């Protein structure tokens, strides 16, 4: 299939349009569509006077060049024209610096304030049938008609060409099928307009990208990208060749460009001979569009937290980080480089950010972190302790599991105003809420059997008997009991989902200690999902971990630098004793971890 002229010469349109007044505006029966945004101008100026963010986007798009891609663009154009090099225009300004071309009509040119003429760092081209070069003091190109632009582009070294208005110019290029993409700003306010963007034929152009939504100059706005579809369009011979059936772009016969246009015509006659296959063009386009859509991102602050990227040489040397453990490591890196410095309850201080998500495929592996050795026995013993509904910290200490030790001391309990509480009586924490939600808590010795709501029993019953229920939730956040807990729950809510004989779990964690807590939480809820899946005769599917306040304690930073510079190993697998059918019957001996390859242990002090 023959390349289209706009594809070869990389011709785009860029514009901003507002909403225009409608008879039904504000009424219930008002109908909106893509043509709702079509207002271009009013009385020779922008209807909205000025929108600083849109101007920033316009400049970002029309000035961005990627010199590493230019050789391929140049080759494509030269091959298309069947010549070895681009002929530089000697009698016109031609910057040695690679730039984009911007093409505008006379009215648009006249609307630009004099101090901004010509548009800097761009090759300015004015399309006018009446103006001449001698009418301008500025370095600009003057063309009389659209086909002259194609001639000019064949002689220039440039990156991309952008049509920037006005309405008649847009219309002419669209009619001649000379627009590859339209970079379109939607100004979400209504203004009086007398000039409008031509209606876009949705059979010829489709929206391929939509940006974030912004506010600027008291209006919301966003940016969309239309791309020319692959539908068979009118052959560009009708645009340039000048056959009798379409004289929109006749050949010039009266100046030095005649030879150049004849070469274009000759190309069409021998199109099969000069076919070029550019399989990576779409990838290059997507890379540029990504840059455009990130125009408003603040440049990454160097050493925001006095941590230098050189501290992560191995981490940063990796081109692809697809191993699922990098979900966790990437969060740590982001927080250490860009996190907010905050004081905290413990007095240690943290770097923190808000809102992350990780997903682990339990059907493929058991996500036990490998960049440091984890205390797996402690993770399992704590989980079994939760499942039994226990609150006595001595039970774990007697098994040399010290996860809750610091939270059960006399000093810690007194700081929580739990003066009456015995040491290591942790109060109505996770296990109590899982098995006795709503029951009155007295102490760690009393028997709470058949008191409160047994949430764990209920969710297992729902999974077995009503697997499509959207109420399969387990909640540890009991507001009434928070002040009685040695430590309010960090991982507060999980929900289960059954499909196709598989069980998935999503867990929300309000407070996320990245150095110590989160690795345990990932493993614990993954094991929990395996256990519930087995007793419900299902297979484990996904564990999804949602993090709220994610933080790195200041006294963990040096240790985490070491961890981030370690390359993860393949995750291990988890095997449960298949004979266990009751969630309460599991013991530590029923869990087997196979092929746990890991780096050395990294010590970190707990901030309590």
Curated annotation (Swiss-Prot):
Catalysed reaction(s)?
(6S)-5,6,7,8-tetrahydrofolate + NADP(+) = 7,8-dihydrofolate + NADPH + H(+); dUMP + (6R)-5,10-methylene-5,6,7,8-tetrahydrofolate = 7,8-dihydrofolate + dTMP
Q: Tell me the segments the record calls region Thymidylate synthase.
A: 322-608
UniProt-recorded Gene Ontology molecular function terms: dihydrofolate reductase activity; thymidylate synthase activity
Q: Can you tell me which residues bind dUMP?
A: 345, 491, 509-513, 521, 551-553
Plastid as UniProt keyword? no
Q: Which domain of life is it from?
A: Eukaryota
**Active site, per annotation:** 490
Q: Which GO terms describe its cellular component?
A: cytosol; mitochondrion
GO BP, one example?
one-carbon metabolic process
- State the UniProt keywords alphabetically: Methyltransferase, Multifunctional enzyme, NADP, Nucleotide biosynthesis, One-carbon metabolism, Oxidoreductase, Transferase
Q: Which residues form a coiled coil?
A: none
Q: Which PANTHER family match?
A: THYMIDYLATE SYNTHASE (PTHR11548:SF2), THYMIDYLATE SYNTHASE 1 (PTHR11548)
Q: Could you describe the subunit structure of this protein?
A: Homodimer.
Q: What else is known?
A: K1 is from a pyrimethamine-resistant strain; FCR3 is a pyrimethamine-sensitive strain.
- Identify its protein family: In the N-terminal section; belongs to the dihydrofolate reductase family. In the C-terminal section; belongs to the thymidylate synthase family.
Q: What this chain does, per the record? A: Bifunctional enzyme. Involved in de novo dTMP biosynthesis. Key enzyme in folate metabolism. Catalyzes an essential reaction for de novo glycine and purine synthesis, DNA precursor synthesis, and for the conversion of dUMP to dTMP.
Please report the name of this protein according to its UniProt entry: Bifunctional dihydrofolate reductase-thymidylate synthase
> Which organism was this protein described from?
Plasmodium falciparum (isolate K1 / Thailand)
